[in-house]
UniProtKB/Swiss-Prot annotation:
Gene, per the UniProt record: rppH
PANTHER family in the cross-refs: M7GPPPN-MRNA HYDROLASE (PTHR23114:SF17)
Name of the protein described by the UniProt record: RNA pyrophosphohydrolase
Native species: Rickettsia prowazekii (strain Madrid E)
Motif extent (Nudix box): 46-67
Summary of subunit composition and partner proteins: Monomer.
PROSITE patterns: NUDIX, NUDIX_BOX
GO cellular component terms, semicolon-separated: cytoplasm
UniProt superkingdom: Bacteria
Length: 161
């Protein structure tokens, strides 16, 4: 018999994108998730609509999550990164159809200013936002995404001048 903690292993990953958005000072945008009581900071991310390219999805998600798409893509990750969500969350997310996400990540230079950011969108995901340093980023991220974030930071850190 299968261990109940492994009952979701046959589920696929949801295809998505993640954005490491940099301001002019090379600080990274993070938002505090609105749907949890614990302090869950993360970089913007979201799903890919069928027929959409990852780069188009990244710019669309940026607009949907931070209320602005003022920026341009500096780099795209060389591979897809994936993470599993904790098993207790699976039934609550994506109708229980996915075990986690596989994401293409984008390093984006934000060309707007703080006044251009509006997290109070039609479907808000964040209730707070801030700019953080590369050094602080990994310490404030929700633990189940930390390994993915470490890989993304490793790939992009040489491009953050």
């Amino acid at each position: 018999m299968r261990n109940s903690s492994n009952k979701y292993l046959d589920l696929p990953y949801r295809p998505g994108v993640g954005m490491m958005i940099l301001n002019a000072d090379n600080q990274i945008f993070v938002g505090k998730r609105i749907d949890t009581k614990i302090s869950s900071w993360q970089m913007p991310q979201g799903g890919i609509v069928p027929g959409e390219t990852p780069s188009i999805a990244a710019m669309r998600e940026m607009l949907e999550e931070i209320g602005s798409n003022k920026g341009y893509i500096i780099a795209e990750s060389k591979c897809w990164y994936s993470y599993d969500v904790p098993s207790f969350l699976i039934p609550k997310l994506w109708n229980g159809n996915f075990r986690g996400q596989k994401q293409r990540w984008f390093l984006i230079r934000f060309t707007g200013n703080n006044k251009d950011i509006n997290i109070h969108t039609s479907n808000p995901e964040f209730d707070q936002w801030r700019w953080t340093s590369l050094d602080e980023l990994l310490s404030i991220i929700i633990p189940f995404k930390r390994k993915l974030y470490q890989a993304v930071v490793k790939e992009f850190e040489s491009l953050i001048q």
